[in-house]
Swiss-Prot record:
NCBIfam families: PorD_Arch, PorD_KorD, PRK09624.1
Stored SUPFAM superfamilies: 4Fe-4S ferredoxins
Keyword tags: 4Fe-4S, Electron transport, Iron, Iron-sulfur, Metal-binding, Repeat, Transport
This protein's name: Pyruvate synthase subunit PorD
Binding site for [4Fe-4S] cluster 1: 53, 56, 59, 93
Boundaries of every 4Fe-4S ferredoxin-type domain copy: 44-73, 74-103
Amino acid sequence: MAESPFKADIERAQKELSEKMTPGAIVYIPGSSVINKTGSWRVFKPEFNRDKCVRCYLCYIYCPEPAIYLDEEGYPVFDYDYCKGCGICANECPTKAIEMVREVK
């Protein structure tokens, strides 16, 4: 079978693209929400009950923003500057340690 006359062009294009593109499903930096505080328009906010928490980290895993981090003991801490009040954390919590309450400003 004869070699494609375009093989060199294809290989060069693949090399150029591979140098410019990141591997799939990897986000090296979050979107602009880290730069721009996004919690100012929230209607509900998560209220955390430490006594009910089993440290399963589902709230941390499912939070679509960088709004939850873990303290030294592994408990979630909510960064209200970035929390949009979506309620995903409360919905995913198996022990209902997170309750969404109306934001009072």
